[in-house]
Amino acid sequence: SAERGRLDVQLASVLDIDLDPTRQRLLLDSGRNAGVQVGQAVIDAGGLMGQVIATTPSTASVLLLTDPDHAVPVAVARSGIRLVVYGSGRSDALHLADVPLSADVRPGDELLTSGLGGRFPPGFAVGTVGTLRPDDSRAFLEADVTPAAQLDRGRDVLLLRGYKPVPAVDPAALPPAPVPAPGAPAAVQAVSAATNPPASPSATATTRSEPGR
């Protein structure tokens, strides 16, 4: 897309990875001295990995998509439906929740960043939808999502530059999340329209600003 065409990237290597079910992070070998900033999106050849949440002069800490306190607004590449994907605490799966029963979402659909919330540029691969099933309320559907990025195996990553995101916040620094409102936005919109989305609460470090599970 035109938005992606304006982006620059910066290479970094993974120093350490933490895949505890309650904490999914990367430690990179580049920090403030290399121009790394809190809020930068991190990708690999497959797709989105997460976002920088802290830096030192020589390192950066990345909150992975799979962290249970993380969520990212997405759009279904095929239909444009806008939904939210949550971290599951597992490096091999994300959680798609609050899918309306009538939503045009199918197993195998590719999910892309929608750009809503201002944290990530639109159009980056997030994952692939698995089997849809009713959630506990029976009023919505949910599904596991296979991440597009190799979150547990990559040695080198790319940090996006040339995009001004809403900074991420370390979940440990956040106040308790409010009770989420039921339902999820499901307006049918073209993915390309996400390049200029309406104002929306940030899903930053996912405080359940987006509808919760």
Model-flagged regions — what are they?
Residues 1-213:
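A secondary-structure micro-motif
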